[in-house]
């Protein structure tokens, strides 16, 4: 049996699909005539270069088409791989997509489109289409399994406009230990943010905004845990971080209005209706904005 037949059986896949075409090119490479030669290092550069060439200059419509192709590839392409290659191929593709969206472009419109296109899969963290839970390497290298999630990366870089979008879609509320995100915002060392589509902003002001946004999503923020980290010698990125966490998140009783917001958002989150479901509620626009973390 030939290498391509043994590795991959194709029964039905649109010829125009970016990922199907990319796979065809990899399978047909003369240098990979024998199955034993297959390895991550053999095909990762080709996958990255092919997708990077698209993602470097892609507009929103083009990115929409790319995501549509990826979803179709995973769901309907009917490719059958060896398990190890299937994992490698999808992880390289996801790593490349997330790297360009979050680390290179830093464009809120691209992030929101990614969330909209994949929101139906977000409740299953193990799904290859739940891109927001996948890891990527911010300084690109072919090791996506050792990377970080988009939420942690955005917390590290304090991209407040993108952080807000992630929170509006309920990503922080789905976190098992949200205090880790708060700790990252307050304590993660400052670093230069290299962006293509985004001007450099004041990272200190962004950090303050991110803390305020966290207080709109969480009912409790452990100030004690932050102080414990400070006692171990860690330094906060903003000296007055304490001023941006309301006392009702760590000491005083939580506001009833805020608890109502959390309850409604949690119900919408359970039904995978954030944030669009907010605007179908028959309530005043100001309350809709409150639920959507605008105020």
From Swiss-Prot:
Span of domain SOCS box: 232-295
- Which InterPro entries does its entry note? Ankyrin_rpt-contain_sf (IPR036770), ASB17 (IPR039147), SOCS_box (IPR001496), SOCS_box-like_dom_sf (IPR036036)
Keyword line: ANK repeat, Ubl conjugation pathway
Signal sequence residues = none
Pathway linked to the protein: Protein modification; protein ubiquitination
Instruction: State the superkingdom.
Output: Eukaryota
Q: What biological process terms from GO does the record include?
A: intracellular signal transduction; protein ubiquitination
One Pfam family name is SOCS_box
Entry's free-text remark on domains: The SOCS box domain mediates the interaction with the Elongin BC complex, an adapter module in different E3 ubiquitin-protein ligase complexes.
List the PANTHER family. Answer: ANKYRIN REPEAT AND SOCS BOX PROTEIN 17
Q: Which family does it belong to?
A: Belongs to the ankyrin SOCS box (ASB) family.
Give the protein's function: May be a substrate-recognition component of a SCF-like ECS (Elongin-Cullin-SOCS-box protein) E3 ubiquitin-protein ligase complex which mediates the ubiquitination and subsequent proteasomal degradation of target proteins.
According to UniProt, the name of this protein is: Ankyrin repeat and SOCS box protein 17
């Amino acid at each position: 049996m030939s290498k391509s037949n043994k590795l991959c059986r194709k029964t039905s896949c649109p010829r125009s699909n970016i990922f199907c075409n990319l796979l065809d090119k990899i399978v047909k490479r003369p240098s990979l005539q024998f199955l034993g030669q297959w390895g991550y290092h053999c095909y990762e550069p080709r996958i990255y270069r092919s997708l990077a060439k698209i993602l470097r200059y892609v507009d929103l419509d083009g990115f929409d088409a790319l995501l549509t192709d990826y979803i179709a590839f995973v769901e309907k392409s009917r490719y059958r791989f060896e398990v190890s290659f299937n994992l490698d191929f999808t992880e390289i593709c996801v790593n490349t997509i997330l790297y360009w969206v979050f680390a290179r472009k830093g464009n809120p419109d691209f992030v929101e489109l990614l969330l909209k296109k994949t929101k139906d899969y977000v409740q299953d963290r193990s799904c290859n289409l739940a891109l927001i839970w996948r890891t990527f390497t911010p300084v690109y290298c072919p090791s996506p399994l050792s990377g970080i999630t988009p939420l942690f990366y955005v917390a590290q870089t304090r991209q407040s406009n993108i952080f807000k979008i992630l929170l509006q879609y309920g990503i922080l509320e789905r976190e098992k230990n949200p205090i880790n995100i708060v700790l990252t915002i307050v304590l993660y060392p400052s670093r230069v943010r290299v962006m293509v589509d985004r001007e450099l902003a004041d990272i200190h002001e962004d950090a303050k905004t991110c803390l305020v946004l966290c207080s709109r999503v969480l009912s409790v923020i452990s100030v004690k845990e932050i102080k414990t980290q400070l006692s171990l010698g860690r330094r906060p990125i903003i000296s007055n971080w304490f001023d941006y966490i309301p006392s009702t998140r760590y000491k005083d009783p939580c506001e009833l209005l805020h608890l109502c917001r959390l309850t409604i958002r949690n119900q919408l989150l359970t039904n995978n209706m954030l944030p669009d479901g907010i605007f179908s509620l028959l309530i005043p626009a100001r309350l809709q904005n409150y639920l959507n973390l605008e105020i």
